[in-house]
Amino acid sequence: MLLRFTKMHGLGNDFMVLDLVSQHAHVQPKHVKLWGDRNTGVGFDQLLIVEAPSSPDVDFRYRIFNADGSEVEQCGNGARCFARFVQDKRLTVKKSIRVETKGGIIELNIRPDGQVTVDMGPPRLAPAEIPFQAEREALSYEIEVNGQRVELAAVSMGNPHGVLRVENVDSAPVHSLGPQLEVHPRFPKKANIGFLQVLDPHHARLRVWERGVGETQACGTGACAAAVAGIRQGWLQSPVQIDLPGGRLHIEWAGPGQPVMMTGPAVRVYEGQVRL
C-alpha cells in the first residue's frame, strides 16, 4: 500500500510526517529505518506520526521515531511542524491544540505570523525523572569519561538532556564527547547532549548531539533544556534567544514549576508517497 507523507523542517531539523488519522497503517521500526536512509529513502532526522487521541482531553496523539527506528518521548522542533501539519491538512481548525506524547501532554499554539509556540510543560530536574543516576538533585554533576571529568547539567524536557557550557561552540568536541556522553551509564535511557556558549544573559549559541541521530541543525527540546540549565546556573535570564546551526529559537521560562515556552518556525518542504 502507498502512504501519503509530508516532508517538513524546523530550523533544518527535518521530518517525515505521516497522517495516521485518515490513513491506516502499522508502521514498524524496519519501515522507519528504510524511509530514514538519506541515500535510498526519504531521509530525515525523525519520523512524526499523527494519530487519533486516546482520551477526550487531547486533540491528537503525537509519536516520534528517530531515523534508527527507535521511538522517543519528545521532539520540540517536530512539535511545531506537527501543529502546522494538522492545520494545513485540516485535521483541526483550532489555533491551539493539546497533544499526547510519550513524554506527557504539550500545548501547541499557531501564531498569526506563522510561528508556532509550544508549551513544553515544566522541566523535570529530579534525577529519577530525567532519568539520571545521582543521589540527589543538583545544579550540575561531574561525569567521568575516559578518565576525564566533565561537568554538566541534567534536565528532562520529556526526554533526557545533558548540557555542558563551552567557551566556543565552533570548536566544542560535539562529535567526540557527544556520542560518549549520549550512552554514558549515568543516563540509563541515553541522552541528548547540548554544548552551550553564553553570549550575554539573553543570548546563547548551542549545538546538540541528539540521541539516536547524531548532530542536527536544531533541537527544540535541547534549546529548552539549555535555557533551563543556563537560567538555573545564573548564566542566562528569561527570555533567551538560542542560536542553533539551523536558526534561532525564542525560549521563556519563569522558574521552577513553570512551563517552558518555545517559539520558532515550521516549514513544509514537499509532499510524497512511500510504499509500506
From Swiss-Prot:
Pathway: Amino-acid biosynthesis; L-lysine biosynthesis via DAP pathway; DL-2,6-diaminopimelate from LL-2,6-diaminopimelate: step 1/1
Alphabetized InterPro entries for the sequence: DAP_epimerase_AS, DAP_epimerase_DapF
Any one GO BP annotation for this protein: lysine biosynthetic process via diaminopimelate
Site (Important for dimerization): Y270
Any one Gene Ontology cellular component term annotated for this protein: cytosol
Catalytic activity: (2S,6S)-2,6-diaminopimelate = meso-2,6-diaminopimelate
Domain of life (superkingdom): Bacteria
Residues at the site labelled Could be important to modulate the pK values of the two catalytic cysteine residues: H161, E210
Matching PROSITE patterns: DAP_EPIMERASE
A Pfam family this chain is assigned to: DAP_epimerase
Keywords recorded for this protein, A-Z: Amino-acid biosynthesis, Cytoplasm, Isomerase, Lysine biosynthesis
Amino-acid biosynthesis as UniProt keyword: yes
Active-site residues per Swiss-Prot or TrEMBL entry: C75, C219
Subcellular location: Cytoplasm
EC identifiers of the protein: 5.1.1.7
Ligand binding (substrate): N13, Q46, N66, G76, N77, N159, N192, E210, R211, G220, T221
A GO molecular function held by the record: diaminopimelate epimerase activity
Subunit architecture: Homodimer.
Chain's role: Catalyzes the stereoinversion of LL-2,6-diaminopimelate (L,L-DAP) to meso-diaminopimelate (meso-DAP), a precursor of L-lysine and an essential component of the bacterial peptidoglycan.
Similarity comment: family membership: Belongs to the diaminopimelate epimerase family.
Protein name listed in UniProt: Diaminopimelate epimerase
Species assigned in the record: Pseudomonas paraeruginosa (strain DSM 24068 / PA7)
Gene that encodes it: dapF
